[in-house]
């Protein structure tokens, strides 16, 4: 469930800010 939500944010982030993409990536790694 969380993975799907992060996936949507990950795709929406690059559209607005590319720097936040890296933060989301770290969040996914920390979540696991």
Curated annotation (Swiss-Prot):
It comes from the Viruses. This is Uncharacterized protein 73. The lineage of its organism: Viruses, Adnaviria, Zilligvirae, Taleaviricota, Tokiviricetes.
């Amino acid at each position: 469930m969380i993975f799907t939500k992060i996936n949507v944010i990950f795709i929406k982030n690059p559209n607005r800010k590319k720097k936040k993409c890296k933060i989301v990536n770290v969040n996914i790694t920390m979540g696991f």
